[in-house]
Amino acid sequence: IMKRLSKSLAVGLLTVSMALASTAEACTNFLVTKGASKDGSTFITYAADSHTLYGELYYRRAATFPKGTMFTVIDWDSGRPLGQIEQVEHTYSVVGNMNEHQLAISETTYGGRPELEGQGVIDYGSLIYIALQRSKSAREAIQVMTDLVQEYGYYSSGESFTIADPREVWVMEMIGKGVGVKGAVWVAVRIPDDCISAHANQAR
């Protein structure tokens, strides 16, 4: 009887630990507007509860490119090339998830209906870093991101993006239109000044 109980207990604990591990590998964003912070700064957090992301801090140097240069998009999750897009003439310096103009972008994944996952060229991670290299403000980043998926297609599942500059903080949600349909469905909302917000793997 004790052996059976021990085996059942072990199986139960393993099941619970696997469920907890699955739940823990998630992302959380906290958003603070300038009117809600003590010193008038905007700031956002990006907690990715996954050991595979510990210690990663990318540096992308500002650069100038000749007209006609192409940029290869690499899927952030798998490392697989997805295709090429036209490079802009000048890109900004990016450290981690913030660029030289204090524009910062983070995300949490909410997934959504699987039939809406697209087959485009740009995944959610690449969308973040390309926008940081090409934008000076949150509003410009939203324009860049939505223009890119409209032209080249959106590869990922549903995402909530946090986009902040020294003046404004925004949340933008995006999901694909499905197989064979280029572009994405998206909505962007500015967090009112003097307010805070948060999202963690759930669509609004």
Locate the predicted segments by residue:
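Cysteine-dependent hydrolase recognition
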Residues: S37, L132-A138, S156
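Second-shell loop/turn segments in exported
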Residues: E117-G118, S126-S135
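Sec/Tat signal peptide C-region and signal peptidase I cleavage site
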Residues: L20-A26
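A contiguous strand-loop segment
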Residues: C27-Y124, V144-R204
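Bacterial N-terminal signal peptides that target proteins for export
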Residues: I1-V11
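Bacterial N-terminal signal peptides
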Residues: V11-A19
